[in-house]
């Protein structure tokens, strides 16, 4: 037994040294310095060293002995300090060991790879000590970043995996969805930089189920010494729930980095396909280690992963995804085999051997090696391949869940975050800008972009077509359009957010007076100034909350501009009564089209289009409908107006209206429920009613319609609209009826559980509401606000004789007689009257 254990230790040490050498071999001197010094900086704590902070900070790595590079560094520090450094020696120090894991040291490591480091610490550290150690690690991350090396430290309690503890989706340790699988990746890829050897490697595969007993027997026999080994526990049997959760997590990661994540996603799919007889990859590597089978180029973790996935996809006869995963693997290695190397390293030798086995052509290699220059056509093709592969994995995952009748162990919050990010990235919706370049190619910019409009009635669909060519007939005819949409805003947004359209792109446009190059360039400039391309990924909190509009642009008269007809015409209007929604004698709405462009809290980019006289109202209702009552206000709301005339007035009026409506929407029911806003468009008055769950729009052609709208939003009762000769009103109401003013009469019911309302408009038309249960004060307040808020709110053809504020009365019993008294409410004290200016003749202006 002793000889067997010693042989295993020698193999482990040899493979570990091979991995250290490989981790350093392909990297530059800066990475080599950081990688080599990290153990030293965790072992020592000194003001002249990176990572230093005042106070009691746990430091010291068990069994640490500096190598030549590390000793030279320590000697330099001592020379600067002027005296020897105090170093922790012997005993059980706070840090059990320091280990890199993941792609580091494997064939998957390249010059852009980051570095994941596990700092395993003793279980006896208290929370304050752990926090201090975390602060030290954060300072070391910043030090490495200042040198151009991305390092992420993960503090691992040595008992963490025994207690089934987990992190959350906020960090790279992948939340509650992975536990054993995280340990699986660590065991198969860990490189010991300093500290104790990993005990798990010493336990034969056949003893895995008796892991703890076997370890105790080794200690009891004196074959192993307990304080020389890091023991994170065995790899117990995986549940179907854990496979499901981990696979969702990998799909989540694949959204932002698809090439990097496809291989791991398919490994998990292979695991679930073999379930319940799955053998984790770490177990396979350990089995070969114990048997002395140092295959796969030194038990390289990435090569072993590719081998397992290849076996799985071959068994299910999925050649499409097998070819894709090989391409992903090739690109991950970052060795361009079609080009002559400066030197031939071990990665290139391995990759050349694999490519030869796959039978790839020189042309295929050249295409992959030219990835940095891929443009939109090739990137979209690659994106679709990756999307198809991920969706196939997702479908297989759902089948797996159904087959095993899963109750998913991932926390419901994590599952919500994962599925929402998948939805936000992959769900194709009308108006949504699909982002097709998640780290596939670094530059999709185009030298020329041409937007061509096809009117209705032609052979092609009416709408806009985008080409990445200058607008010559030969170029356009011989090329397929990159993208089509009915509306220009969607095409411009798609080109901008996918990186085709940059400040250096030359723009061309062909349309029949809908839009010209100047207007197009203005739109591009406005979008680029207000919508940054790069934003932080949405937080888990944002993903498990309802999506909210973050940045909103309201694009006015881009495609249809009513003011264009004013050119060289004499237009009659009065500047003091200028209303861009009901302009001039014809009461024309000067907004012909509105496009919305917004980015939400899930980082989705959406566009919408509205045209015609109702564009303003439809756009308003849509914007407000996307804001739930408790949403945060948008971070920015910008109005881009492209009218030929009165541009500033139109922009200002829309900005004012939208801001006011957003304020009403987000403040309704917090203070004053059921608020509304009257808007006059094309000579008609419309009411926007702000309720708890929605915003409704109703036309208010006359007073009775308005009261009906108010009452339906405010009161619960039976509404009957009648004429005075069809019903006998209470005599006291008949006696009070007066033409030219609007009157409300409130009457209590016999059971005292509600009230009736009699409404008489200016022409004494009547509307009656029986058994109302709402608030009289709220109704009075809203009606009063409506009538004190704007001029000329109904059509000129309505039969108003006077425009007095409504009168409110209460029907009461006094001294045995039915009487009418004024309705008393604090609300009435807040009313204000807008004095109308004396009428002035309209002035004439000629617009050019």
UniProtKB/Swiss-Prot annotation:
It comes from the Bacteria. Its EC number is 4.6.1.1. Residues 1-535 are annotated as: Catalytic. GO terms for cellular component: cytoplasm. It is found in: Cytoplasm. The regulatory domain is involved in the regulation of cyclase activity by the carbon source. GO terms for biological process: cAMP biosynthetic process. GO terms for molecular function: adenylate cyclase activity; ATP binding. It is an enzyme of class 4 (lyase). Residues 541-848 are annotated as: Regulatory. It catalyses: ATP = 3',5'-cyclic AMP + diphosphate. Pfam families: Adenyl_cycl_N (PF12633), Adenylate_cycl (PF01295). Signal peptide: none annotated. Keywords: ATP-binding, cAMP biosynthesis, Cytoplasm, Lyase, Nucleotide-binding. Belongs to the adenylyl cyclase class-1 family. This is Adenylate cyclase. It comes from Yersinia intermedia. The gene is cya.
């Amino acid at each position: 037994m002793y000889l067997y254990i010693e042989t295993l230790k020698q193999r482990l040490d040899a493979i570990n040294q091979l991995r250290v050498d490989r981790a350093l071999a392909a990297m530059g001197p800066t990475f080599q310095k950081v990688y080599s010094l990290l153990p030293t900086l965790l072992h020592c704590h000194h003001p002249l060293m990176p990572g230093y902070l005042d106070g009691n900070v746990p430091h010291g790595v068990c069994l640490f002995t500096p190598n030549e590079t590390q000793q030279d560094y320590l000697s330099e520090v001592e020379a600067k300090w002027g005296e020897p450094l105090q170093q922790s020696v012997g005993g059980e120090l706070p840090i059990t060991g320091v280990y890199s894991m993941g792609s580091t040291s494997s064939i998957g490591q390249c010059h852009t790879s980051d570095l994941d480091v596990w700092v395993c610490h003793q279980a006896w550290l208290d929370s304050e000590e752990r926090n201090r150690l975390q602060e030290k690690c954060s300072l070391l991350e910043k030090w490495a970043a200042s040198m151009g090396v991305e390092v992420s430290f993960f503090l691992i309690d040595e008992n963490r995996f025994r207690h089934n503890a987990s992190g959350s989706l906020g960090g790279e340790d992948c939340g509650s969805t992975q536990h054993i699988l995280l340990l699986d990746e660590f065991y198969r890829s860990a490189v010991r930089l300093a500290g104790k050897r990993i005990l798990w490697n010493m336990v034969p595969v056949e003893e895995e189920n008796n892991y703890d007993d076997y370890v105790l027997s080794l200690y009891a026999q004196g074959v192993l010494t307990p304080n020389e080994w890091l023991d994170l526990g065995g790899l117990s049997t995986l549940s179907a729930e854990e496979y499901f959760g981990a696979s969702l997590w990998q799909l989540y990661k694949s959204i932002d980095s698809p090439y990097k994540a496809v291989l791991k996603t398919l490994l998990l799919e292979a695991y679930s396909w073999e379930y319940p007889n799955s053998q984790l990859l770490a177990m396979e590597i350990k089995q070969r280690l114990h048997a002395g089978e140092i295959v796969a180029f030194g038990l390289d973790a990435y090569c072993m992963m590719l081998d397992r996935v290849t076996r799985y996809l071959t068994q299910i006869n999925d050649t499409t995804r097998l070819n894709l995963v090989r391409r992903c693997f090739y690109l991950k290695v970052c060795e361009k085999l079609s080009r002559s190397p400066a030197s031939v390293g071990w990665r290139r030798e391995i990759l050349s051997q694999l490519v030869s086995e796959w039978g790839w052509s020189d042309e295929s290699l050249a295409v992959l090696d030219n990835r940095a220059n891929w443009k939109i056509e090739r990137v979209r093709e690659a994106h679709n391949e990756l999307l198809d592969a991920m969706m196939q994995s997702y479908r297989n995952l759902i089948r797996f869940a159904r087959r095993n009748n899963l109750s998913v162990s991932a926390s419901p919050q994590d599952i919500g975050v994962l599925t929402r990010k998948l939805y936000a990235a992959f769900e194709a919706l009308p108006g949504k800008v699909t982002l097709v370049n998640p780290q596939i190619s670094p530059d999709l910019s185009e030298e020329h972009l041409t937007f061509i409009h096809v009117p209705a009635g032609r052979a092609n669909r009416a709408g806009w077509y985008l080409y990445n060519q200058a607008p010559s007939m030969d170029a356009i005819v011989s090329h397929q359009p990159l993208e089509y949409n009915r509306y220009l805003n969607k095409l411009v947004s798609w080109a901008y957010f996918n990186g085709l359209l940059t400040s250096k792109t030359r723009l061309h446009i062909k349309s029949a007076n809908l839009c010209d190059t100047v207007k197009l360039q203005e739109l591009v400039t406005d979008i680029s100034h207000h919508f940054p391309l790069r934003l932080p990924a949405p937080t888990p909190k944002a993903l498990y909350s309802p999506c909210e509009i973050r940045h909103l642009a309201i694009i006015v008269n881009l495609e249809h501009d009513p003011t264009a007809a004013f050119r060289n015409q004499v237009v009659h209007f009065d500047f003091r009564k200028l209303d861009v929604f009901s302009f001039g004698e014809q009461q024309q709405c000067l907004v012909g089209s509105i496009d919305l462009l917004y980015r939400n809290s899930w980082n989705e980019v959406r566009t919408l289009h509205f045209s015609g006289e109702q564009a303003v109202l439809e756009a308003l209702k849509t914007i407000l409908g996307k804001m739930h009552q408790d949403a945060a206000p948008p971070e920015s709301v910008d109005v881009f107006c492209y009218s030929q005339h009165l541009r500033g007035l139109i922009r200002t009026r829309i900005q004012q209206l939208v801001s006011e409506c957003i304020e009403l929407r987000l403040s309704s029911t917090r203070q004053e429920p059921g608020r509304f806003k009257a808007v006059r468009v094309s000579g008609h008055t419309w009411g926007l009613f702000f309720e708890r769950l929605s915003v409704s729009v109703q036309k208010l052609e006359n007073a009775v319609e308005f009261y009906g709208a108010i009452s339906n939003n405010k009161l619960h009762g039976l509404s009957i609209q009648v004429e005075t000769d069809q019903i006998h009103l209470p005599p006291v109401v008949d006696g009070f009826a007066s033409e030219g003013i609007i009157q409300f009469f409130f009457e209590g019911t016999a059971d005292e559980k509600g009230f009736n309302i009699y409404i008489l408009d200016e022409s004494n038309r009547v509307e009656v509401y029986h058994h109302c249960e709402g608030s009289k004060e709220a109704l009075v307040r809203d009606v009063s606000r409506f009538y004190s808020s704007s001029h000329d709110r109904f059509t000129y053809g309505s039969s108003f004789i006077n425009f007095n504020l409504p009168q409110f009365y209460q029907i009461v019993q006094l001294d045995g007689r039915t009487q009418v008294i004024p309705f008393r409410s604090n609300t009435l004290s807040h009313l204000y009257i807008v004095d109308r200016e004396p009428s002035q003749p309209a002035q004439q202006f000629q617009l050019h």
